[in-house]
Amino acid sequence: MSQYFEVHPQNPQPRLLKQAVQILHGGGIAAIPTDSSYALVCHLDDKAAAESLRRIRGVDDKHHLTLLCRDLSELASYARVDNKQYRLLKLATPGPYTFILEATKEVPRRVSHPSRRTIGLRVPQHAVTQALLELLGQPLLATTLIPPGETEPLNDPQEIRERFQKSVAAIVDAGACPMQPTTVIDLSNDGPILVRQGRGDPAVLGLSADS
């Protein structure tokens, strides 16, 4: 049975978030709000938790997981970022964009793409997500909370509680989130490639839905 934390969306209570972080440190999976949709998250260094994350989400190791980072400085510790890529990142962070980049040695091989050695990274613009990351002191491993066999992310914390209370260790309820996943941009090759149109406007990066 999961623990349920109801927090203020702009000024989350530190006491409750500290309890959620303790659960993450202990290897638990949590459902948390972000600026795009609710996400399933776990501690980056916990192998068993990462396997559980994939199992709950219903994806294999070829599905890009995402690192939620506090800022671009932290992101650059986990991905190889050149000057051109950094300028693009600055245009769209923080915000509902996920960038696929080549992972550094700081990223465990088991959570990066098995053949490409890439990883999704983003800097969310949500007070609760940022507060959790600050308390944890490192990125969270994440995936959009889309139930297996479905195409839309979950938005209602009560529905998440009903459907996932036996699967996740913690649910952080900050009210409804947007129902769109992030816009995914692949920066691991020569130029930016729009992989998925989501909540973030690709025009910020000079891209269109036809790119």
Predicted regions and their residues:
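Active-site-adjacent structural elements in enzyme catalytic cores
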Residues: 1-211
